[in-house]
Amino acid sequence: MVDYTIGEGMDVITTLNYYGFGDPLLLLAGICPESGLEILYGLLIFVRMYLSGVFFSWFCFEKKHTKRTAVLLGAVSYVFCEYALFGGIRHPFFLNGMMYLPLYLLGVERILQKKRYGIFSVAVCLSLISNFYFGYMNTIMMALYVVFVLFPQPQKRIREKAAILIRMIGAYLAGVMASGAIMFPVVSAYLSCSRSGEGGYTESLLQYPEWFYDNLKEGYFHTNLYVGQWTTLGFTYLAGVGVLILFLRWSRSRRERLRNWALRIGFVLLTVMLCVPLAGRVMNGFGYASNRWDYAYAMLMSYIMVVTLPMLLHLLSRRLPVWIEKTNRHLAVVAGVFASQRFWCALLSVVLLVNLEANIVDAFGRDGCTKLSEYSQIGTSAGDDQGMTQMQADSDGFYRIETPWHIGNQSLEEQYQGHNWYFSIAPGWYFDYYHQFLLNSMERKYSLRGLDSRTALNEVAATKYYVAGQEENPMVPYGYKYIGTNEAGRYVYENQNFLPLGYTVSGWMKKSDFELLSPIDRQEVLLQAAVLEDDDADRVSLMPSAASNLKIDTAQEACTVVSCSGITWDKNMLHVTQDGGSIELRFRGRANCETYLWFNEFQVKWAAAQYQVGSVTAAGRTNQFVLMDPRKSAWYDEPSQTVNLGYSKEPVTSCVITFPKRGLYSLDEFLVVYESMDNYQTKTDVLRQDTLKNCKVETNRISGDMNLSKTKLLQLSIPYSSGWSATVNGKKAKILCSQDMYMAIELGSGRSHVELRYMTPWLKAGVGSSAAGVVIIWMMFFGVPHVRRSRKKKG
């Protein structure tokens, strides 16, 4: 299903699954009143943490660990590791990986013990539908666990091990099949999303910078430090003691020796993985290096504690009293107290709880990894109300609202169509489209903070209203007229040249030619032609190319540096020597233009803050641009930016650039580009000559009528997706990807009824897979055991 309040029209399943769409626990939201949703949101954090401890304990008991105190302390240590305190409370869905990993390993153990293995399939299914990203990481950890547990067993022959492995793979695939309705579409979307490629970490893949290892040592037992690359450790000292005992104590039993050697090797392996960026990249779906999998490391540490705590209790209750008596006979009474395992269990429990309390205080303290000051009070989660809901209800038809640099995803909460979004699984072509214009508000590959008040970009995106704050001189695009304030008291401007959802163009340009133009020239093309893939353009034979007829009303010039404060610029290196450093530029200016400042070949080499927002002030208006250090995980290779200085009837002749923090930047030059508005209305009038009439926008369906005097391309301000299909007068029509972003359909002369329908890609195949998977799992629980019992009775 497509939802136009998600981004600019993204798929519900593929976009929201990363945030819990599909999580069975979130079904509770369906019966919870709206007023209680925030409370439910908070409660589910602790429910997930509790279930993580329950499943961990279940796994330990399945492993025949009967010392309940050891299991309880291990579970508590696991539940309150730094990963849960930092990642789990900040992003509750991050707890899903932590919650289901013990179930994965429990399922493996049950298969090894020749018990029912339906639980394993159910765990795989629930994990993948809750969040396939963490399901992927759990799968890798499960595979490592199988290697360490199955293959070292000398009593099992190779043939027997192969049979067990085949059963595991079969049970795993059954779980994958059952999750297909959600997993198939999501995996398909992930493979084409902008976040799945390289980015963020730019150093060697074999070792992190020295600062990472310094932080790693300090953050191993402390929660008041963020190590970096999503590495969250903060273990208890008791867990550290468990590791020491594991490596120093020798077991007499062969079975225990094999188990302990497996744990030692596993500990070393996971520690090495923490320290090698390549491992972080593999675990992060071959994106940037990230150690979000370190909840598995926390589980290993907690399990080592469960294994070694009985050894520690034996040493303390047996060896220590003997040593005390030998040292001083007068301490026999004390030795008698120390000989009680209950005493040591109680004492170690207190020590662990005090340690955890200190970790929690450190984590949420002023210098902690997750400061309380970063969270909002309950009841204020929606931020400042923009009054968009009422605006959307008061107007007919499909349109979008521009609210520059506003809160991402608030359009989803307030139910209006906008341009502000932040989604980890966003289609890759969204980024490709905005990247063509070096759009400064595309702060990350998966986050858009509005369209930078750019007239052309808003026009082709069906933007009807511009909502600004109460500043004296807002950066309103050309052609927008003030119509009053909305219910939130914000200024509202209406687009006088509004292009509806469907409009027509009579020319096209090949993408290869489009890419030869400068960023602002490309904006000019959007208003005159459809930009098509070269193969598609060759097939549109009835339409003349508009390349030779385009009118590009732009000009550019170099800037002159007037003054610098806290900044030096020499040999293409811009050095900001103090916080708040600024540089003033002068240029001739041009009337009736949208003026852009172009940071040409501009990159952060080093900055005091990994993420900062700079500002450019011109003609009393201020705009923003993002500065991201290569150390930041969201960094991507963007050598230039363009920043809109706004539309003005009078020439804009100067601007001041401010850098919040110290840093070193490479920069070839500052350029100013002017986009004239002299012929703007003429261009939009041409596009409005033939528009989609009787347009209806419904759930997964768009329809309307056209009456053309000649062949044209119907351009739709809906993002392209393979999930859309189209018919014209009942016959299937090809949907073209236009502008690298939107959809276009070629229409002949005469009357045409156009209808588009949406189906989530891979959803049909996924539903069929889920049906088959559920049947197989049902057979695992009920069918196979019934057959076995019948055979035993006959025997």
Q: Residue spans of the language-model regions?
A:
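Membrane-interface coil-to-helix junctions
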Residues: 1-53, 76-99, 137, 190-195, ...
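Periplasmic/ER-lumenal interhelical loops and adjacent helix-loop junctions
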Residues: 1-6, 17-18, 24, 164-252, ...
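Extracytoplasmic/lumenal acceptor-recognition loop(s) of multi-pass membrane glycoenzymes
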Residues: 8, 18, 354-374, 391-460, ...
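Membrane-embedded helix bundles of polyisoprenyl
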Residues: 50-63, 67-152, 167-187, 192, ...
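Membrane-interface junctions at the ends of membrane-embedded or membrane-associated helices
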Residues: 63-66, 109-119, 149-163, 251-256, ...
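Membrane-helix boundary/interfacial segments in multi-pass membrane proteins
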Residues: 86-95, 199-215, 219-231, 257-334, ...
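Membrane-interface helix-loop-helix junctions at transmembrane boundaries of multi-pass membrane enzymes
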Residues: 155-166, 244-271, 421, 436
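Active-site-proximal, structured, solvent-exposed surfaces of multi-pass membrane proteins
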Residues: 548, 554-795
